[in-house]
């Protein structure tokens, strides 16, 4: 689809397709005048025939083709004219090929069987073709979907190498065979479809295509020379020294065999003591719990029982959290090796195409300027422009988002060349110009200061235009929005509108100021109709998967939130170091990057950075089966999202040692399991040099398959799995990306609108086994879990320069609402069929990975014992009772050892992870704040939603900034019921401290000893809630009065009732009220 095609809107169900042009759209562009003297395949001169006239390859239409291209097409191509599809006739001097008719006027015995020159030339071409197309995927060639045609038209194949055949002298087929298997004799001879009215260079076919084959042949010859040199070094020939150019090439050949990444284990000097302390802590914890359960407090039995139940649950929760961190690792990548292998200077890039997804809903809560910065950082990434496509999903169908993207596309034509010329970081202009650093460091170009000043002025003008659009959007017209040409905006009704697609940049979408092409930028708003379930973000992401497969079909997908910009322009290459690695790429479902944030206060009061999770938990999971998917900053293997199983080796099929020890050996069933995986992945592991099917076969029942493949490839089963879109189904089998070569460009618009229609997913496996999985507001956990259950692994990539940065809700109310959403999703999964406690035991999910997922979904339940344990100190102080009886010196040892083991475990964890003690303490504090508020609400809301069907809506976290100060929003306390429970806990403990001290003062000196243990217990709770208390007292004029009123009222009523109705009052006045001293854990 051309970038100048305008906005395309339509509905498949209503059989509507409308094209809306902008005022800036011009008329029909004049076609390039072809004078017939230039070959339209390679770009060279056509040359002369033996008679001295201009060489004419096709006698029917005289389409300009030079003699070398004519010979190549006859020998190894389609043997047909690209324009009229007529079979080339043999000219005098050309060798005879199969199918030539006897023609008296051109037969010459001298050249009829002279294959030497022509075959040698064709062989050289095939050498280059085979090398260029299979150098990246030597272990598994690329499957051809049809007959290997190269198509022209509106959508160009992002990876032209991904659809070429590999037949030839060094390929898998016969020396003289034509690479077109599975040809139906009833069908016409396959041809290369070319539009004669357009310049072939615009389709990536002509000059570049021919030169790539020639350069590939040269590289193949150099590779053969290196192999011969290696034989001499092995003693099979004379002494040849690797000096000069040969030595450099030999070194390069060695570099191509080196891994592009490696695992960096944590030093044993740090990890071994950590593991020893964990085991000791487990032993101590067992003795501690044994003592607590066997020594009740008789005169405070309810308090003791409550505390013991809480402590047992805390111990269980600690085990779930601790053991997945048993084998943490680090990783490092080698971008130079990636460049040597796939992206050499002066050669066509062999990097695979990548589609980047950006999701947004409400432009008033997710400011268009933030989204624009994210898009600009994507368009200027350090990656081949023809291999990157950016898709922006507007799930709110807002015209403001559409207009801001239009402005962003125009500004990108200036911003992208500036970034690449001066190699600046980050490439989001808002954050680049806001940096308080020496921006002249490492800059040597004299024009940098002048151009930077001009670019900053351009960006400020761009911001003014965006702000004007935002101001205009504040007041919605009664008749709805209209576009520049007066056409009503199709998305005026956000709940009832057609699907919309607009290509802003890309092929034929305009060049940047330096005359270079830009990555494709595509706006997508899926169709929405009343009565259809849209599944929120998960549904929008699945729509992007389908529409991207139809238009560009990148082999890998990278999704980011609209507020997460590329902080590292090489982030995609960092992911490709794993995805394109021959050893692990075929079994890696995604590469997860950590989340890093801007705009957070120095002390990170509410633990927005999540440092402990990303630098400790995620590294621990990376050593097992990989990190969990966190919803953004993740690069996916498209095949994994399609529900396929990974390509497993013998080693992968061996049971995990922990599973083997816990569940017994599975060697008996290994062969059958392997066969099952071979069978299920057969479509991707078969001979990829043979086309999988003709496009016509999709509508004819997929005829012509062998028995094994027909199990998966029947028309009914494929449509039930992927939906009824032949173009999309064809794209799903292009394992290395790219558009199927026989796809008709004229059908792409219709298919793109079709696959984002509201009813496309009906009676398919979308959201169940394919794509983002439905069933929870935290679709990221379910999606990653399903992939891991199939046997895929994931990778945690933490480069020195953070790959992505985003904005976090520094306001406590918004932060708690965000945590509430995450916890609510966990409860939904816990009560669903996808619960990791019982789901996926027949898959390849490893035991520790399963434990990590169980911990991910059960952690909100910890809020119930946590809030009970936080109120216990107040009960003890008010009633003058305690949860621990008088203990002996022997029993006190277990209390002391437990506290020491907890402290040492934390210290050693910080030692190997590099996390600061302040970050660790902030994480502990917010664990209590979130546990006594958001997690508690999530448990009850989740039960209501799943069991009673009462849905609770969540709001998008606001990314807008406050202009009153850098962290002015930090002190805002918006009204939310989530603030009541922690405020009540604070007040109850403060009242308990006052009551306990008053009782000690009135009772004399002997009561101060037991008081210290209770005060320590209460102060420990208050210390964890200190950030919350500081926020309440920070700016009292901004604290909601209703929060204070409700909290004080609940705390006072509860305290007074407890004093009035004391369940621990003994009827015997001579009873001993002394409860002794002790710990509080």
Curated annotation (Swiss-Prot):
GO CC annotation: endosome; Golgi apparatus; plasma membrane; trans-Golgi network
Description of how the protein assembles with itself and partners: Interacts with CESA3 and CESA6. Assembly with CESA3 and CESA6 is required for functional complex in primary cell wall cellulose synthesis. Interacts with STL1 and STL2, but not with GOT1. Binds to CSI1. Interacts with PAT24/TIP1.
Cytoplasmic topology ranges: 1-270, 321-856, 911-925, 998-1008, 1060-1081
Protein name: Cellulose synthase A catalytic subunit 1 [UDP-forming]
Gene (UniProt): CESA1
Annotated binding of Mn(2+), by residue: 537, 561
Positions bearing N-acetylmethionine: 1
Basic and acidic residues compositional bias, start-end: 127-139
Positions annotated to bind Zn(2+) 2: 58, 61, 81, 84
């Amino acid at each position: 689809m051309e970038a100048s095609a305008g906005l395309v809107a339509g509905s498949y169900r209503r059989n509507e397709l409308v094209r809306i042009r902008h005022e800036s759209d011009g008329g029909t562009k004049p076609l390039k005048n072809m004078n017939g003297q230039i070959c339209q395949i390679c770009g060279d001169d056509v040359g002369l025939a033996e008679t001295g006239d201009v060489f004419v390859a096709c006698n029917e239409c005289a389409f300009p083709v030079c003699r070398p291209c004519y010979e190549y097409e006859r020998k190894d191509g389609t043997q047909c004219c690209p324009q009229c599809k007529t079979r080339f006739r043999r000219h005098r001097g050309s060798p005879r090929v199969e199918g030539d008719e006897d023609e008296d006027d051109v037969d010459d015995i001298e050249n009829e069987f002279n294959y030497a020159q022509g075959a040698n030339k064709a062989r050289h071409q095939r050498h280059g073709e085979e090398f260029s197309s299979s150098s990246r995927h030597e272990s598994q060639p690329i499957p051809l979907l049809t007959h290997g045609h190269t198509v022209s038209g509106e959508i160009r194949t992002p990876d032209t190498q991904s659809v070429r055949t590999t037949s030839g002298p060094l390929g898998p087929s016969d020396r003289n065979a034509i690479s077109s298997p599975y040809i139906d004799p009833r069908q016409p001879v396959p041809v290369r479809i070319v539009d004669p009215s357009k310049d072939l260079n615009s389709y990536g076919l002509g000059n570049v295509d021919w030169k790539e084959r020639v350069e590939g042949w040269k590289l193949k010859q150099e590779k053969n020379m290196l192999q011969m040199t290696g034989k001499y070094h092995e003693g099979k020939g004379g002494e040849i020294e690797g000096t000069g150019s040969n030595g450099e090439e030999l070194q390069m050949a060695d570099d191509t065999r080196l891994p592009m990444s490696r695992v960096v284990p944590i030093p044993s000097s740090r990890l071994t003591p950590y593991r020893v302390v964990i085991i000791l802590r487990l032993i101590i914890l067992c003795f501690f719990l044994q003592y607590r359960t066997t020594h009740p407090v008789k005169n405070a039995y309810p308090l003791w029982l409550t505390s013991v139940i809480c402590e047992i649950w805390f111990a269980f929760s600690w085990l779930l959290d601790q053991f997945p961190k048993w084998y943490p690792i680090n990783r490092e990548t080698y971008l130079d090796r990636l460049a040597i292998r796939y992206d050499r200077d002066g050669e066509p890039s062999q990097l695979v195409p990548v589609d980047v997804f950006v999701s947004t809903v409400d432009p008033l809560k997710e400011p268009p300027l933030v989204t624009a910065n994210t898009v600009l950082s994507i368009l200027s990434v350090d990656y081949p422009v023809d291999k990157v496509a950016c898709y922006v999903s507007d799930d709110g169908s807002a015209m403001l988002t559409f207009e801001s993207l239009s402005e962003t596309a125009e500004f990108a034509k200036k911003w992208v060349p500036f970034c690449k010329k001066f190699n600046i970081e980050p490439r989001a202009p808002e954050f680049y110009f806001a940096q308080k650093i020496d921006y002249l460091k490492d800059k040597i170009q004299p024009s940098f200061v002048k151009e930077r000043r001009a670019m900053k002025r351009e960006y400020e003008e761009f911001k003014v235009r965006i702000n004007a659009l935002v101001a205009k959007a504040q007041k919605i017209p009664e008749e709805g929005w209209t576009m520049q040409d007066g056409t009503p905006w199709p998305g005026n009704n956000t709940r009832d509108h057609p699907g919309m697609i607009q290509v802003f940049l890309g092929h034929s979408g305009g060049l940047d100021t330096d005359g270079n092409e830009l990555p494709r930028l595509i706006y997508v708003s899926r169709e929405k109709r009343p009565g259809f379930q849209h599944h929120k973000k998960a549904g929008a992401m699945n729509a992007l998967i389908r529409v991207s497969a139809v238009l560009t079909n990148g082999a890998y997908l990278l999704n980011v939130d609209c507020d997460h910009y590329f902080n590292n322009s090489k982030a995609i290459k960092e992911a490709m170091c794993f995805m394109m690695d021959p050893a692990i790429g075929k079994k890696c479902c995604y590469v997860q990057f950590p989340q890093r944030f801007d705009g957070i206060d120095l002390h990170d009061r509410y633990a927005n950075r999540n440092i402990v999770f990303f630098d400790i938990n995620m590294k621990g999971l990376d050593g097992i089966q990989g990190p969990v998917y966190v919803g953004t900053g993740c690069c996916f293997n498209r095949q994994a999202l399609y529900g396929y199983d990974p390509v497993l080796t013998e080693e992968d099929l061996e049971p995990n040692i922990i599973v083997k020890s816990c569940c017994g050996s599975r060697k008996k069933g290994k062969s059958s399991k392997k066969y099952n995986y071979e069978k299920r992945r057969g479509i991707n592991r078969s001979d990829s040099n043979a086309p999988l099917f003709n496009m016509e076969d999709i509508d004819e029942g997929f005829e012509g398959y062998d028995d094994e493949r027909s199990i998966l490839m029947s028309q009914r089963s494929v449509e039930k799995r992927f939906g009824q879109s032949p173009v999309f189904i064809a794209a799903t089998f292009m394992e290395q990306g790219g558009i199927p070569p026989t796809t008709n460009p004229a059908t792409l618009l219709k298919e793109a609108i079709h696959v984002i229609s509201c009813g496309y997913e009906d009676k398919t496996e979308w959201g169940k086994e394919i794509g983002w999985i439905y069933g929870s507001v935290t679709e990221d956990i379910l999606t990653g879990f399903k992939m891991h259950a199939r046997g895929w692994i994931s990778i945690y990539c933490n480069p020195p320069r953070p790959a992505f940065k985003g904005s976090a809700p520094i306001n406590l109310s918004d932060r708690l609402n965000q945590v509430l959403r995450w916890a609510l999703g966990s409860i939904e999964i816990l009560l669903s069929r996808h619960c990791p406690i019982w789901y996926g035991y027949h898959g390849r999910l490893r035991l520790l990975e399963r434990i990590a997922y169980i911990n991910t979904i059960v952690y909100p339940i910890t809020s119930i014992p946590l809030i009970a344990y936080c109120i216990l100190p107040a009960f003890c102080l008010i009633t003058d009772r305690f949860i621990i009886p008088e203990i002996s010196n022997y029993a006190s040892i277990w209390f002391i050892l437990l506290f020491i083991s907890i402290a040492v475990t934390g210290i050693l964890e910080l030692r190997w992870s590099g996390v600061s003690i302040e970050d660790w303490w902030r994480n502990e504090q917010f664990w209590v704040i979130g546990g006594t508020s958001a997690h508690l609400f999530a448990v009850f809301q989740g039960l209501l939603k799943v069991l009673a069907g009462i849905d609770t809506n969540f709001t998008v976290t606001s990314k807008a900034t406050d202009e009153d100060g850098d962290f002015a929003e930090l002190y805002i306390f918006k009204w939310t019921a989530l603030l009541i429970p922690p405020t009540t806990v604070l007040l109850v403990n403060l009242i308990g401290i006052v009551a306990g001290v008053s009782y000690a003062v009135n009772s004399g000196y002997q009561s101060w000893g037991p008081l210290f243990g209770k005060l320590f217990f209460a102060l420990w709770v208050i210390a964890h809630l200190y950030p919350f208390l500081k926020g309440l007292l920070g700016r009292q004029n901004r604290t909601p009065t209703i929060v204070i009123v409700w909290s004080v009222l609940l705390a006072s009523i509860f305290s007074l009732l407890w004093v009035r109705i004391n369940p621990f009052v003994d009827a015997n006045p001579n009873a001993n009220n002394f409860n002794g001293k002790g710990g509080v854990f």
